Amino acid sequence: MNDPLASAAEARSATVRLAVDCMGGDHGPSVTLPACRAFLAAHPGAELLLVGRPEALAPAAGWERCTLVSASEVVAMDDPVEVALRRKRDSSLRVAISQVKPVDGVAAAQACVSAGNTGALMAVARYVLKTLDGIDRPAIATVMPNQLDGHTTVLDLGANVDCTAEHLLQFAVMGSALVAAVEGKANPSVGLLNIGEEAIKGSETIKRAGELLRAAAAGGQLNFVGNVEGNDIFTGRTDIVVCDGFVGNVALKTAEGLASMLSSFIRQEFTRSWYSKLAALVALPVLRHFKNRVDHRRYNGAALLGLRGLVFKSHGSADAFAFEQALNRAYDAARNRLLDRVHDRISATLQALPADAGAPDGQVPEAA
């Protein structure tokens, strides 16, 4: 009989190898290399494939548990998708993604992390890795803080501006697999973002998505609790909130802007006078805790779900601390076999649904 504790210990001790696009993002190696070094120090069981121009990676030469992979080109943050796909075939972004594509059944890395151009990353990842069976379009998923001192997983966050009801169902399945794998929740709750809780509200697409999600819940494939509203992302009513990429991206950027504004307001008020500065000293422990809870850098690292390989997107403007969080998320996903879990859950769910619930449409996803 297998010992679950021994199995868990063995899984934790297994080596996880990540491929890192060191040239991506607004800051490139000046951010990615320090983040990689901090990540390695915190994860003795991890190895990194650092991808980029040799001269840029020179400071990492000789690092333990690191392999340098040469790439002669860089995808700029404003490069069109077609440039990344057709012209820059030796870009650090593409080479890093290629490390997670199996060759003779074995991949060089278990997950890829990049802070590069979102549209290019999604398009190249889809071209190189392809989508899983039963998935029309990949989705971007990340976590947002909630008032329960936890977080809510939200998807899609910008990969697909226009979605069908079937796409939203697939997002729910993939999001459930993500939360189950990384957070250990066997049956995470799912809500469908809408303008009200009632099933009669919303567009025809949302209504149809609700029907599909309820059917999946009736078959025991999902824990769908119904429609949720925007504020429910932050109340923690559900573990997962599903929406199209346009709405999700707006919600994400709004939340980041609000957190920044609140921090600015608090700073202004506590520096307004000598009395307020004195009050700030007294409240300093509380303020630090508040800042830590709303710091969007802690939640950096969005998963590109639905591909035949694990790819994580860091914010393009991330600093070293934020990029390290993206590495942490990729590490946890790889260690907990996220890819296998997504595949298994998709297969089980689609078998219980009508055959028209998602034939691949072959379209390249849009990027917000």
Swiss-Prot record:
InterPro entries for this protein: FA_synthesis (IPR003664), Phospholipid_synth_PlsX-like (IPR012281)
One BP annotation, GO: fatty acid biosynthetic process
Keywords, sorted A to Z: Cytoplasm, Lipid biosynthesis, Lipid metabolism, Phospholipid biosynthesis, Phospholipid metabolism, Transferase
Catalytic activity from the UniProt record: a fatty acyl-[ACP] + phosphate = an acyl phosphate + holo-[ACP]
Gene3D superfamilies xrefs: Isopropylmalate Dehydrogenase (3.40.718.10)
Annotated GO CC locations: cytoplasm
Top-level lineage group: Bacteria
Protein location: Cytoplasm
Protein EC: 2.3.1.274
Pathway: Lipid metabolism; phospholipid metabolism
Gene Ontology MF terms: phosphate:acyl-[acyl carrier protein] acyltransferase activity
A Pfam family recorded for this sequence: FA_synthesis
Subunit structure: Homodimer. Probably interacts with PlsY.
Family: Belongs to the PlsX family.
Stored HAMAP family: PlsX
Function: Catalyzes the reversible formation of acyl-phosphate (acyl-PO(4)) from acyl-[acyl-carrier-protein] (acyl-ACP). This enzyme utilizes acyl-ACP as fatty acyl donor, but not acyl-CoA.
Designated name of the protein: Phosphate acyltransferase
Species this protein is from: Methylibium petroleiphilum (strain ATCC BAA-1232 / LMG 22953 / PM1)
High-level lineage: Bacteria, Pseudomonadati, Pseudomonadota, Betaproteobacteria, Burkholderiales
